[in-house]
Amino acid sequence: MLLKNGMVLLKDRIECVDIRVKEEKIVEIGAKLSENNDEILDLKGLYIAPGAIDVHTHFNINVGIFSADDFKSGTTAALFGGTTTVIDHPGFGPKGCNLEYMVDKYMEYGKTAACDYSFHGVAQEIDEHTFDGLRALKAKGLNSFKIYLTYTYKQTDKEIVEFFKMAKELDMVVAVHAENDTMIEELRGNFVKEGKTDIIYHAYSRPGDVEAEAVARLIKIAHMVGYEKLYLVHISSKEAMDEIAIAKSQGKKFFVETCTQYLYLDNTKYFEADAVKYVLSPPLREQEDIESLWYNIKTGNIDVVATDHCSFTMEDKNKGVSDFSKCPNGIPGVEERNLIMFSEVLNKNLTVKEYLDLVAVNPAKIFGLYNRKGSIEVGKDADLVVFKAENNKIDEKNLKSKAGYSCFNGFNVSAVIDKVILRGNLAIDNTAQKINSQIKGKFIAR
């Protein structure tokens, strides 16, 4: 296959060059390449970017209620949105299960994937078998795992120290959900006792300080241990970003992720008639938090924009319509992210380098994919997204998530996704809303 005449996003610039693809790989990049009996895609006037990577999704998750999206529908939505690789966070397994239990289950789910995929391990408890379990995950091709500071299997400071020591020895990334559980439970319990159960109290029960305290503690523990691969997921607040900026200015090494929703949506959504659909954790915040996140993107303190895609139907979300504590937490977003972020390049709010770093380069580098994915270079997988500059609006009726709605419905974008190429195969023709069902996702060892 030869992609001709496209405007190609290369590291920090856009060049009009051709891309030759053979046997799933990019084999040549240059101006006016000879055709050599190749299948030709003339992409004049269109932009070509590397396939985006979403390192934070939750498909097939069971939180007492099953998510709307299984692995097939979730990865299909990802692919239609120009995300060609996901790294999924499995849910918790039964109490006492080993570290491989949920990964093995998800390996089976992955066989239905439309795009390429990998997994993070999920660490629930720590015991004499944990180190061997982490080593087993690494042998399966997983170089990362997640721990939580809240929810059922929250970790103590002592356990965090031990996890960081193990991860340092094994050269693994630890992704952490950073919220102080004691503070949340105190606030939420008081609100529920007082009958303050409107949706806005979900946000009030998880203020920015809840996140900032946990973030500061994690950074300090990692620094004490000499661990430099802490990955802070879905950072949402100015308070947390202030702690992060101070630590980064001191030379401390760790990674920071935010999500599309925290860059665009604020907590005024919790006063709207459909407020329940915006319930997620951390919650949506205020405009000053949004401004802080964008400022820290520009300063380089934020490494990744992911989605934390965790979708539930409105039927399930409405179980919490009169009591926020009964609402399943999570929103869809895996299809919307890449289009929204690329639009910021056309709107000149992001440079080419900033966009590529946030959605492709840094996710690939941090999680061990960069030898194959994350940029348009000879020798890498031919994962490519073709954009057409065009003023448009996101329409939830056209999206592939089984949630049936989008928190970005009606959102203005400056492009549409024309085609998606997965490992050299034309997987999506968005102009025809068509997917090549013969193309299957592959597990990518890291």
Feature annotation, model-predicted:
Residues 129-305:
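Histidine/acidic residue-rich metal-binding segments in metalloenzymes
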Residues 1-51:
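Histidine-rich, glycine-flanked metal-binding segment
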Residues 108-122:
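A glycine-rich helix N-cap at a beta->alpha junction
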Residues 197-227, 298-299, 303-305, 311-391:
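His/Asp/Glu-enriched, well-ordered alpha-helical/loop segment
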Residues 44-112, 129:
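Metal-associated gating/positioning segment near the N- to mid-region
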Residues 90-92, 122, 150, 179-180, ...:
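Short, ordered loop/turn segments at secondary-structure junctions
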Residues 6, 319, 323, 378-444:
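C-terminal cap of metal-dependent C-N hydrolases
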Residues 6, 19, 24, 45, ...:
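Divalent metal-coordination and catalytic microenvironments
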